Amino acid sequence: MGSGQWHVEKRSTFRNDSFVREYGIVPETGCLSIIVLGASGDLAKKKTFPALFNLYRQGFLNPDEVHIFGYARTKISDEELRDRIRGYLVDEKNAEQAEALSKFLQLIKYVSGPYDAEEGFQRLDKAISEHEISKNSTEGSSRRLFYLALPPSVYPSVCKMIKTCCMNKSDLGGWTRIVVEKPFGKDLESAEQLSSQIGELFDESQIYRIDHYLGKELVQNMLVLRFANRFFLPLWNRDNIENVQIVFREDFGTEGRGGYFDEYGIIRDIIQNHLLQVLCLVAMEKPISLKPEHIRDEKVKVLQSVVPISDDEVVLGQYEGYRDDDTVPNDSNTPTFATTILRIHNERWEGVPFILKAGKALNSRKAEIRIQFKDVPGDIFRCQKQGRNEFVIRLQPSEAMYMKLTVKQPGLDMNTVQSELDLSYGQRYQGVAIPEAYERLILDTIKGDQQHFVRRDELKVAWEIFTPLLHRIDKGEVKSIPYKPGSRGPKEADQLLEKAGYLQTHGYIWIPPTL
């Protein structure tokens, strides 16, 4: 945009308080017990506890109501758990944060025990009940939120123990909810088996299948962008859009997680869940309301419209050196890179390729959505070689969105040049802290809002799309192509994009605006 001074406007915001009333998402009071199962693991330390601390600092967790319980097999004390997570929460040199941290850590109690025996969960229930008795009076309810920061293999036994020993028993009302992390199975059969095992114990309204991509700021912005802006409505279809890319790139490899990653691969790890969820929001029809079930109904409909994936529209890759990890088999075919084209058979999207691309050890780190529009018919300026209009939504890092367009280059001649209209969140929303995805989603579970969580039928259809391809990969029928770390990935992937109709703008680089 130029190098001059930026003027940051102050604009009014509209807070839709009627939303919570209309859709039954109402604030609750009373004792809130948050139980982090797998409390000594990396996920809990790096994501769950930091999200809880940030919610506490912002006033969303009332210290007069909430208590946090860690549960794991590791035999440690309350203070040892606090010491383990302390360094992941704040820089203690900040006096204000250090004071908040000290108060937050005092809310945490630890219980150790196995995941498949009642004895440990009975002690956990006793600790929770003591907290509830100390906090509750004649008013209020008892709410229990179980966050399973655990591998899916132990979900069935843990859920059975929760159901047997740890359900909310208050006569004053309240609820018991569970949060489960991906991966939800490895294919359709295992996902359905897992869903059945959990579904026999809990109602769907109690189950929150978390996909942290649905908590990202610009992913949550998709419905607002699409359905609250008039100029997008007539353009968002096959008559105007040439192709859609949803991209996830990392500039590092598996880094010590090779054995775990090799069981799943990049499609199970990223594409079948994160990128497919983004596709739903880009491609779905307008829901009749913002009720969570209405939104999730439309996501299921668009997934049901995806046609089977053709091997001709898939490129797999594996970066050189991946098998050097001692935990990875020498003959592994597991892809660390994949580009696959999905096609949606409906009136809006017939003929438009949705290109889902993800990879590790590439030349950059970013996640973005690229909506590329069709060429202008009757190009009187002869500028099509400069590139098409493209609407780009940068999910990470440095959240932003920009529209690539052709304009007249300043000067006496009639020359055209590619430029952009852009919105960089760091520049536009200075001083506004953008919440982490886990903060939003944990708060949603407390509120009882399932809009940003995956429903069972949605999960089933997602696996139906990818399971046939995954089984062919597992059998070695689709091979991974070697690529150099730090590259764009296999050259065959670029050839597939070109075949699908994607036109790259050579020489154009978007530069985020600076103050």
Swiss-Prot record:
This is Glucose-6-phosphate 1-dehydrogenase 6, cytoplasmic. Optimum pH is 8.0. InterPro entries: G6P_DH, G6P_DH_AS, G6P_DH_C, G6P_DH_NAD-bd, NAD(P)-bd_dom_sf. It catalyses: D-glucose 6-phosphate + NADP(+) = 6-phospho-D-glucono-1,5-lactone + NADPH + H(+). It comes from Arabidopsis thaliana (Mouse-ear cress). Forms homodimer. It is an enzyme of class 1 (oxidoreductase). NADP(+) 1 binds at G38, A39, S40, G41, D42, L43, A44, K45, R73, Y155, K182. It is found in: Cytoplasm, Cytosol. The gene is G6PD6.
